[in-house]
């Protein structure tokens, strides 16, 4: 029977046994270990050299002691080094075992902590949703209507509580006029010059998909239905989903900044405020919600309509919202108070509105209807000043160019029409493939490019109105498209639950 050292796993030359652990060791190894640690290496109990019990076994004849210059001396030195390595290896094995036990314990603790955090997060989210639904910043709403103003409703409709409408006061009208004057002056100064930083058409034509994100909205209720970019920082992306949520996403860090919950139905329109950390959303639940991004909370609920809200646009002042609805009305609301200032319908039409968009100057705006009409309205007078017929299906999207005199419109007739607001006529029609659906139209900030999203994404250069770019990456219908600053990138969303970016 051979004895094996518990430290080196080799047959010992001078075996001994520890009465503390009953293990066999090579005497020279265990003496070195005791000199360093004073314990038994197996159970860490106190152990001294005197306690070691030698085991009598037959030994081979030992060679004479080696001299310092002989090969046996070298072998002896190697033996000592090997002994040290064995001791170190044994210590490392013990430490590894201890570390494994500690890691296992830490993983169990981490798993338990994650479960607690998830439960608490769910409870906090539910509490916030309840608060946003039951008490949407009641303290911010002005308790009394403006005494000097009268409610302003044009056309026939269901009777309304007069206390809900404040009216277009002279101060508001003057504010709108002053802003329009400033914007018109700035546009004239710019003239027809194109910013030097704007991406050239030959560069834009080389754009390819560079990123795709599918984790913004729920996978169980797929579909991103609305898209907007922050005008002051186009790296901040706003989306609205079929999962009833509004999401703020940072393109540069690829992180979700906020997930805003409160709508009871899908979110179909979203708008970013250009200078405040506010975002706006509209839904078929007949509400418009104003959200604080830093607080991830709803600060105001605007109840301007009796039916689904179909369009949303922010006035250039940043203080007022335009909305359209299936209830055949458009409404003009104050974002600070959440009050509806005026609510108007065209009694001659009697048709639901499908979209709404402010002109860049803010004194006129356009609405689309279910019966193929595009209507231009004077905001100050609340009157319909022009109609653009020509489409043969419900209007799906309208977009004003920053140059101030182009209007692009799309409908369920697989075409995009371009209108000259100065001459009030259609000067160009982009006839698309049969059954091509258009859900989103937008000009870039310079008015140089027009993007449309629907069956796929197409980019046109204005004036020539020729297609320079075509993307088919979405596996579902494209619902939103937008340009980055100076068209440095293009963003799109679709029913495939993805947010995609295109650039060089």
From Swiss-Prot:
Q: In which tissues is it expressed?
A: Expressed in white and brown adipose tissues, brain and to a lower extent in liver, kidney, muscle, lung and spleen (at protein level).
* Positions of WD repeats: 219-259, 262-301, 304-345, 348-387, 390-429, 433-472, 473-503
Region described as May mediate interaction with PSMC5: 68-223
- Reactions this protein catalyses: S-ubiquitinyl-[E2 ubiquitin-conjugating enzyme]-L-cysteine + [acceptor protein]-L-lysine = [E2 ubiquitin-conjugating enzyme]-L-cysteine + N(6)-ubiquitinyl-[acceptor protein]-L-lysine
Q: Which GO terms describe its molecular function?
A: identical protein binding; ubiquitin protein ligase activity; ubiquitin-ubiquitin ligase activity
Q: Which SUPFAM superfamilies match?
A: RING/U-box, WD40 repeat-like
* Pathway(s) the chain acts in: Protein modification; protein ubiquitination
Gene Ontology CC terms: cytoplasm; DNA replication factor A complex; lipid droplet; nuclear speck; nucleus; Prp19 complex; site of double-strand break; spindle
Q: What class of enzyme is it?
A: transferase
Q: Which Gene3D superfamilies match?
A: YVTN repeat-like/Quinoprotein amine dehydrogenase, Zinc/RING finger domain, C3HC4 (zinc finger)
Name of this protein: Pre-mRNA-processing factor 19
What is the organism field in this record?
Mus musculus
Taxonomic classification: Eukaryota, Metazoa, Chordata, Craniata, Vertebrata
């Amino acid at each position: 029977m051979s004895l094996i050292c518990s430290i080196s796993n080799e047959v010992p030359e001078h075996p001994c046994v520890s009465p503390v652990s009953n293990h066999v060791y090579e005497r020279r190894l265990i003496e070195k270990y005791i000199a360093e640690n004073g314990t038994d290496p197996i159970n860490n109990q106190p152990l001294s050299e005197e306690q070691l019990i030698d085991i009598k076994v037959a030994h081979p004849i030992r060679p004479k002691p080696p001299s310092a210059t002989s090969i046996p001396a070298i072998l002896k030195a190697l033996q000592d080094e090997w002994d040290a390595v064995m001791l170190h290896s044994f210590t490392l094995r013990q430490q590894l075992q201890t570390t494994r036990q500690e890691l296992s314990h830490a993983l169990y603790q981490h798993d338990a902590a994650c479960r607690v955090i998830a439960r608490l997060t769910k409870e906090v989210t539910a509490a916030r949703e309840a608060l946003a639904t039951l008490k949407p910043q009641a303290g911010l709403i002005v308790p009394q209507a403006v005494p000097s103003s009268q409610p302003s409703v044009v056309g026939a409709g269901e009777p309304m509580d007069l206390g809900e409408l404040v009216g277009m006061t002279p101060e508001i009208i003057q504010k709108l006029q002053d802003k329009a004057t400033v914007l018109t002056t700035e546009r004239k100064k710019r003239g027809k010059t194109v910013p030097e930083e704007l991406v050239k058409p030959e560069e834009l034509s080389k754009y390819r998909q560079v990123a795709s994100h599918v984790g913004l909205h729920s996978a169980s209720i797929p579909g991103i239905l609305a898209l907007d970019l922050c005008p002051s920082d186009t790296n901040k992306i706003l989306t609205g989903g079929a999962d009833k949520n509004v999401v703020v996403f940072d393109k540069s860090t690829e992180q979700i900044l906020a997930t805003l919950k409160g709508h009871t139905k899908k979110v179909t329109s979203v708008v970013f405020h250009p200078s405040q950390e506010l975002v706006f959303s509209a839904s078929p639940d007949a509400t418009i919600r104003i959200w604080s991004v830093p607080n991830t909370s709803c600060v105001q609920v605007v109840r301007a309509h009796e039916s689904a809200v179909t369009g949303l646009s922010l006035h250039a002042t940043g203080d007022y919202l335009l909305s359209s609805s299936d209830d055949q009305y458009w409404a003009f609301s104050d974002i600070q108070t959440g009050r509806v200032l005026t609510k108007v319908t065209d009694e001659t039409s009697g048709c639901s509105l499908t979209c709404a968009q402010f002109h860049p100057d803010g004194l006129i705006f356009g609405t689309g209807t279910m019966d193929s009409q595009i209507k231009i309205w004077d905001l100050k007078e609340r009157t319909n000043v022009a109609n653009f017929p020509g489409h043969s299906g419900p209007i799906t999207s309208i977009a004003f160019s920053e140059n101030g005199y182009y209007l692009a419109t799309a409908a369920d007739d697989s075409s995009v029409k371009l209108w000259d607001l100065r001459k009030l006529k259609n000067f160009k029609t982009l006839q698309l493939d049969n059954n091509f659906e258009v859900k989103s139209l937008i000009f870039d900030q310079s008015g140089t490019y027009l993007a449309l999203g629907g069956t796929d994404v197409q980019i046109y250069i204005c004036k020539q109105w020729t297609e320079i770019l075509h993307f088919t990456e979405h596996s579902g219908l494209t619902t939103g498209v937008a340009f980055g600053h100076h068209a440095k990138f293009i963003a799109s969303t679709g029913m495939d639950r993805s947010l995609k970016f295109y650039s060089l």
